[in-house]
Amino acid sequence: MLMGEFTHTIDSKGRLIIPAKFREQLGAHFIVTRGLDGCLFGYPLNEWAILEQKLKALPLTKRDARAFVRFLYSAATDCEIDKQGRINIPITLRTHASLEKKCVIVGVSNRLEIWSAERWNKFTSETADNFDEIAEDLNIDF
């Protein structure tokens, strides 16, 4: 399970350090693609395979399904972790997530998310203000 929050800097070549805690669970390489809310999603290969089966089951006749699958797959890339613990994030993905300098890498159960620090701070601030209401709406019993 991926969990926790880490801040690292992305360099001008698009290289970002993946926290050691996550590297152990992700393996030597994993899939990174566009995520929701303006971040990137990173999936271990076994989790990507599960998602891929769900995407294949979507009806090709539905316009939204085709658009979603295209958008997700067109930017998906197999990222290999180098000897320094870094991955190279392509410009398309950096642009999608507005990654320029300071990044936040977040573990979210079966995936990691990569956020620009600015977007992450905005998201956490807004969510903190409504956390109780969100839990109630989702009927989560702690």
From Swiss-Prot:
Keywords: Cytoplasm, DNA-binding, Repeat, Transcription, Transcription regulation. It is found in: Cytoplasm, Nucleoid. Its main location: cytoplasm. One of its GO terms (cellular component) is nucleoid. NCBIfam families: division/cell wall cluster transcriptional repressor MraZ (TIGR00242). PANTHER family: TRANSCRIPTIONAL REGULATOR MRAZ. This is Transcriptional regulator MraZ. It comes from Limosilactobacillus reuteri (strain DSM 20016).
